[in-house]
Every structure is written in C-alpha cells, then in structure tokens.
C-alpha cells in the first residue's frame, strides 16, 4: 500500500491539511452563504406567497364588487323601467282625461248651439204667427169692407186654416 502511496506522491499530512481546509471552507460557506441565501429565498417565498394571497383576496373582493355593481345596475334598470311604465301610464291617463274633457266641451257647445237654434226657431215661428195674424186681420178688414158671400167666407176660413197649419 505504501508503494501505491509513493507512486501517487501521497502525503498524509497534506491530505489532512487539505481535508481540514475543505471542511473550514465548507463551514464558512455554510455560515456566510448558505444560511443567508436560504433566509433570502425563504423570505422571497413568503413574500411571493403573501402577494399571491393578497392577489387572491383582491380578486375575490373585485368579484364581489363586480357582482354588487351588476346587482345595482340591474336594480337601476328595473327602477328605470318602472319609472318609464309609470310615466307611460300617466301619459295615457292624461291623454284620456284631455280627450274626455274635449268631448264634454264639444257636447256642451253642441247642446248650447241646439238651444240657441231652438230659441231662434221659436222666435221666428212667433214672428211668423204674429205676421200671419196681422195678415189675417188685414185680410179680414178688407173682406169686411166688401160684403161677403157665404162662398167667400168659407174660402177665407179655409185659407186662414191652411196658413196657420203651414206656419206650424
């Protein structure tokens, strides 16, 4: 075995010092590099995890707000439709009321016109009767001026009756 060690130029003291150097370097690397690097990675992982949780919470909150806004929008649409329906109903009622008032006013005007026509007709008939009576008196006066025969009297009576019937 010694022959192998001599062929390889193996020195146990060098090997021991190199092993100790390796262990010291590994210890120093562990203390100064691996632990801080592990801590940085753990902190980064925790920060990323927190950010993901915050993002999930923010997304859930945004979805809740969106759902609430959609519900409010639906409510606003329903309210707008209800207002539109009420306005349409009120417009129809107002239209019907205006039409009824116009119809009633037209009926009152027509009735007033009919009453005025009847009054004028009555006045005209009274005037005609008065005129007919005057004419009858005038005719009677003229007839009396001359002597009447029974045929003339009968003819005058028939004419007066016909005139009165015609005037009525």
Curated annotation (Swiss-Prot):
Keyword vocabulary terms for this entry: ATP synthesis, Cell membrane, CF(0), Hydrogen ion transport, Ion transport, Membrane, Transmembrane, Transmembrane helix, Transport
Topology relative to the membrane: Single-pass membrane protein
Main localization (coarse): membrane
One matching Pfam family: ATP-synt_B
Residues passing through the membrane, by range: 13-33
NCBIfam families named among the record's database cross-references: ATP_synt_b (TIGR01144)
Described purpose of this protein according to its UniProt entry: F(1)F(0) ATP synthase produces ATP from ADP in the presence of a proton or sodium gradient. F-type ATPases consist of two structural domains, F(1) containing the extramembraneous catalytic core and F(0) containing the membrane proton channel, linked together by a central stalk and a peripheral stalk. During catalysis, ATP synthesis in the catalytic domain of F(1) is coupled via a rotary mechanism of the central stalk subunits to proton translocation.
Name listed for the protein in its UniProt record: ATP synthase subunit b
Species assigned in the record: Moorella thermoacetica (strain ATCC 39073 / JCM 9320)
Lineage, broadest ranks: Bacteria, Bacillati, Bacillota, Clostridia, Moorellales
């Amino acid at each position: 075995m010694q022959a192998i060690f001599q062929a390889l130029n193996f020195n146990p003291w060098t090997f021991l010092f190199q092993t100790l150097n390796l262990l010291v370097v590994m210890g120093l690397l562990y203390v100064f590099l691996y632990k801080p690097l592990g801590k940085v990675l753990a902190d980064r992982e925790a920060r990323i995890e927190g950010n993901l949780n915050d993002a999930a919470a923010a997304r859930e909150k945004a979805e809740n707000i969106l759902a609430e806004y959609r519900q409010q929008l639906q409510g606003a649409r329903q309210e707008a439709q209800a207002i539109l329906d009420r306005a349409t109903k009120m417009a129809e009622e107002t239209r019907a009321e205006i039409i009824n008032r116009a119809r009633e006013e037209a009926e009152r005007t027509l009735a007033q016109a009919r009453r005025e026509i009847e009054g004028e007709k009555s006045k005209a008939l009274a005037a005609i009767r008065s005129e007919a009576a005057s004419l009858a008196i005038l005719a009677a006066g003229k007839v009396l001026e001359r002597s009447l025969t029974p045929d003339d009297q009968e003819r005058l009576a028939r004419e007066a009756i016909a005139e009165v019937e015609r005037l009525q």
